[in-house]
């Protein structure tokens, strides 16, 4: 399995305990060093240009990375590309208009990413880790739903609001509301 944006392998132990052969890819060398030593099977590279052949992995997984790349749907397409036929692609990402869309600059991101970034710097004396326009971008549920709807290489198995109770899943059908009450969106696909 491939963990796109997996950093130093935060999910490595859970996946290997379940029997998976784990590979991680990350573009941020600083993030890769987060747990100390870079783990085996770790590749430095871009999620938007995965350095693997088509159909290389049974499971391609990404947790909270799409909002950190300038072209999230290019990354999502790359993830589907390297998933083998019958395999699973799992994406989850933080929605910009959700409560934590601005990450550490929340809730000030509701006034714009540039404002939130400047305010954070003024308050803390340094830039936030997630810099608006550089390493943090606006990604919405609407974009994810549109992307999933036009997939010709994979079928959608589930689209759910991560961290929300099951009774709230129907809110994804209400434009506008879904953007604010959904903290994080999960899209699960099976490659055709």
Spans of features found by a protein language model:
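Conserved SAM-binding loop
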Residues: 1-101, 187-191
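S-adenosyl-L-methionine-dependent methyltransferase catalytic module, highlighting the catalytic core
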Residues: 70-78, 84, 88-190
